[in-house]
Amino acid sequence: MSSTLPDPHLDQLFVQARTHNAWTSKPVTDDTIHALYDLLKWAPTAANSNPGRFVFVRSAEAKARLLKSVAPGNVDKVKAAPCCVIVAYDTEFHDLLPQLFPARDMRSGFVGKPELITETAKRNSALQGAYLILAARALGLDAGPMSGFDHVALDAEFFPDGRWKSNFLCNIGYGDAEKLFPRNPRLAFEDACRVL
């Protein structure tokens, strides 16, 4: 991990990568979905907790279920995308810590602490969702993350037992570059950073 990636790779992951809202008809295959997860799973989470859970919504039936909870401004985006990922978290993630972090007991620090469980799960599943976006870009896909949906309705539809809870949605596929908006600016270093 000692070398800097070449500029074309950095462009693909960050500098030239765009958030897509329109998509080509090229499908996202099972092999691609597996490759995507097999990349993102290696990225760091607190105590290797890996609370993120991912539901890859592709079928017309599953899309129809999902669209019931999507904000009106996002409906067409989800319809057009070959795959929409529900980035969720497992409220019982800590039960797997003996397997995921065998070096010492991390599970007991969460037992009986629902606020800590929720805070840790939300933060780290959001991290894993960001890793999903980078993994998608690394594999030549595009991504379009969204937070405009009814969490309660979605969770009732897809996670009725209450164990998993939704964090955000992310369309993935092969974006239609001709339908991109002009690139929006970003904050300058001086506006967003402090060095102490």
UniProtKB/Swiss-Prot annotation:
<comment type="similarity">
    <text>Belongs to the nitroreductase family. HadB/RutE subfamily.</text>
</comment>
<keyword id="KW-0520">NAD</keyword>
<keyword id="KW-0521">NADP</keyword>
<dbReference type="InterPro" id="IPR050461">
    <property type="entry name" value="Nitroreductase_HadB/RutE"/>
</dbReference>
<dbReference type="InterPro" id="IPR000415">
    <property type="entry name" value="Nitroreductase-like"/>
</dbReference>
<keyword id="KW-0288">FMN</keyword>
<keyword id="KW-0285">Flavoprotein</keyword>
<dbReference type="GO" id="GO:0016491">
    <property type="term" value="F:oxidoreductase activity"/>
</dbReference>
<protein>
    <recommendedName>
        <fullName>Putative NADH dehydrogenase/NAD(P)H nitroreductase Rpal_4764</fullName>
        <ecNumber>1.-.-.-</ecNumber>
    </recommendedName>
</protein>
<dbReference type="InterPro" id="IPR029479">
    <property type="entry name" value="Nitroreductase"/>
</dbReference>
<dbReference type="Pfam" id="PF00881">
    <property type="entry name" value="Nitroreductase"/>
</dbReference>
<dbReference type="InterPro" id="IPR023936">
    <property type="entry name" value="RutE-like"/>
</dbReference>
<keyword id="KW-0560">Oxidoreductase</keyword>
